[in-house]
């Protein structure tokens, strides 16, 4: 993985509900946006890193610096398949998500080649409590972030399906990656995305 492999500037969510759980911010209408990230710390989020107990932020992998959420492997001696995931403390099912991301830093020497300039958001996922200690990825549907490696087209926004399948227009899709029609972006460029999940 990258020593600092992607950075989130802001994460906003629009919900079709006004219900609240545990005093966390909620939208008052289906068109109101709420911030999932407070710009200060990881409040409202739970960390899960392969090989480490739920809630342990091994190596300070997920950190907030200057109001930006960063994913960093700076404190790792080696990657050793320690994939990191960050979960919101509230599960969502129907929502719109807006955020920005970019890649920075250099890949760790022992990380698998496929993780180069590769990250994403699990838009539907198994709960963090159900993930096994050494499980690399949650069973999920992932909106994949990719960046240009200088080897030709590498579009962002693919859908990946670790441990599951996808149905599109009534047809079962069993391939792991469903390619998007999005462009290829340079590695250090901020990319704005919006996802609608029904």
Predicted regions and their residues:
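Bacterial N-terminal signal peptides that target proteins for export
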Residues: 1-7
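Carbohydrate-interacting regions of secretory-pathway proteins
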Residues: 21-198
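Bacterial N-terminal signal peptides
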Residues: 7-16
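A subset of signal/propeptide-processing and intrinsically disordered low-complexity segments
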Residues: 1, 17-18
